[in-house]
Amino acid sequence: MLYDKDIRLPLFDFLEDNYGDIIILEEKQMGRSRADIVMVGRDNNIYGVEIKSDADTYARLGRQVKDYDKYFDYNIVVVGTSHAYHIEEHVPEYWGIITVELEDGEVDFYMLRQAKPNPKMKWKSKITLMWRPELAKIQEWNNMPKYKDKSKAFVQGKILERMPEKISEEVLKKQMCELLFCRDYDTIGDDIKDFKSKSK
C-alpha cells in the first residue's frame, strides 16, 4: 500500500519529465480545501494536483473538486491502484488522471488521462494565489495606480476590472506565472515587510 509520503517526491520527478520546466509551490488553502500540489508551468498555466493514496477515501473529493475548479487552469488527480478503476466516476472529464503503483520496489506512474482546460476556473479565486508584493509588480507592469494604502482584496479587484479590455487573460496568465517562478519562500517575509514599510 502506498501512502501520500511515498508518492509525493517521486511524483515531482514524474511531473517534471512530463511537463518540462515547472515549479512546485507549497500547499495552498483554497476555500474549505487544501491543494496537495500547486504546479506552475512554462506554458503559463497553473495546475492543481490532488493526491489520493491507497489509504485515502473519496469522502471529501466532491467538495475538493469544486474548490480546485475555482483556482486552477488545469487539474490532475493522482491515485493509488485501489482507486484506479473508479476514479473516472468521481472527477470531471476535463481532469487529468495519473495512476501510481509499486513495481519491483519502485514507485511507478502512468498517465491514464491528460488534463484538459478547466472551464470553471474563476479569476476572482485564481488571483488570490498572488502575494501583495507580487500584485504590486502586476500593477507596475500594467501602468496601474499603486493603491499603496488599499487592501490586497481591493487591488485584486482593480486588476480584474481591467480584464479583458486593458489586460488580456493571456497577459495576466503570463505575468502571474513569471512571478510565481521567481517566488522565494525564504525571503518573502522580508519582501512583505519592505512593501508595507514603503506603503506608509
Where in the sequence are the language-model features?
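Catalytic cores of nucleic-acid endonucleases
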Residues: 56-99
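Conserved catalytic cores of phosphodiester-cleaving nucleases, focusing on short active-site segments
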Residues: 37-39, 45-55
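Structured loop/turn residues at beta-strand edges in well-structured enzyme cores
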Residues: 43-44, 70
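Structural signal for conserved beta-strand scaffold positions within catalytic alpha/beta enzyme cores
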Residues: 26, 50, 98-99
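Non-catalytic C-terminal interaction segments of nucleic acid-processing enzymes
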Residues: 96-200
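Surface-exposed, flexible loop/turn segments at secondary-structure boundaries
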Residues: 32, 45, 83, 105
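Active-site metal-binding core of divalent-cation-utilizing nuclease and nuclease-like domains
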Residues: 2-43
